[in-house]
Amino acid sequence: MVKVYAPASSANMSVGFDVLGAAVTPVDGTLLGDVVSVEAANHFRLHNLGRFADKLPPEPRENIVYQCWERFCQALGKTIPVAMTLEKNMPIGSGLGSSACSVVAALVAMNEHCGKPLNDTRLLALMGELEGRISGSIHYDNVAPCFLGGMQLMIEENGIISQQVPGFDEWLWVLAYPGIKVSTAEARAILPAQYRRQDCIAHGRHLAGFIHACYSRQPQLAAALMKDVIAEPYRARLLPGFSQARQAVSEIGALASGISGSGPTLFALCDKPETAQRVADWLSKHYLQNQEGFVHICRLDTAGARVVG
């Protein structure tokens, strides 16, 4: 049997709509991600378990893990009978790359089970295709960091899908999921079809400056450039209490904050453990809306998807 863990990810990072994403892991050792196991069988079977298994489609063919198996078999040109188990630890529609976790874990597990017939580039292309079935369009800002680890910048030129951007070891990512669902498709539909020239210029300046600051090792500058003129001005209205939370974490000392992916998870960047804890405490009390919500203090997950059994 092969068992693969795929970590949560925070896409966009305010400054890089659809082109930046970071894999994250809680500092307390909690596994924030999905696990898929694969073993040989006489015919295909899929079993779901985990905290959020009851939120998955009841029809197996609608489950993205089934679709991953089907697409992987197509890529190899043969049917591979396996029993798969999805441990669904990630809330759906959370802005933490939930569908990407399932897709990445399923495809890596299938590839490992079959002796790695597909290389990383081919696997990543399949991951983007399958994740796009859920979000409505192909983009790699969750699957790339989830698969490869760290911060990833989407390139999609010269056969290169993404490349790693150096992160900062001192950065702590406080992630607060309020316990409500935001559909990625709905969050995309709310965005305008056209943007003002000054917003396009600001977006380019922020993103170019952020990448430069990462490579020139200027964490304060990088954090200061994490501004969103593309999505947050429109999506904030979908997130109850978001604007107040941003103001509060800034006053506590967060370097930057914003919407993780399409929401509703809020991320706040801190460079001191005590600041991160104070931010986490405030968000736990004021941003969470129900028992399904949670707050984690995380660092970059530099390993990405990995075999755990």
Swiss-Prot record:
EC numbers: 2.7.1.39
Read off the InterPro entries from this record: GHMP_kinase_C_dom, GHMP_kinase_C_sf, GHMP_kinase_N_dom, GHMP_knse_ATP-bd_CS, Homoserine_kinase, Ribosomal_Su5_D2-typ_SF, Ribsml_uS5_D2-typ_fold_subgr
Question: Does Signal appear among the keywords?
Answer: no
An example Gene Ontology biological process: threonine biosynthetic process
Q: Where in the cell is it found?
A: Cytoplasm
Q: Which GO terms describe its cellular component?
A: cytoplasm
Q: Which UniProt keywords apply?
A: Amino-acid biosynthesis, ATP-binding, Cytoplasm, Kinase, Nucleotide-binding, Threonine biosynthesis, Transferase
Recorded catalytic reaction(s): these are: L-homoserine + ATP = O-phospho-L-homoserine + ADP + H(+)
This protein's record includes keyword Protein transport? no
Residues holding ATP: P91, I92, G93, S94, G95, L96, G97, S98, S99, A100, C101
GO molecular function, one example?
A: ATP binding
The pathway is: Amino-acid biosynthesis; L-threonine biosynthesis; L-threonine from L-aspartate: step 4/5
Q: Which HAMAP family match?
A: Homoser_kinase
Family, similarity comment: Belongs to the GHMP kinase family. Homoserine kinase subfamily.
Its function, per the record, reads: Catalyzes the ATP-dependent phosphorylation of L-homoserine to L-homoserine phosphate.
> Which NCBIfam families does this UniProt record tie to the protein?
PRK01212.1-4, thrB
Record protein name field: Homoserine kinase
What lineage, starting at the top, does this entry show? Answer: Bacteria, Pseudomonadati, Pseudomonadota, Gammaproteobacteria, Enterobacterales
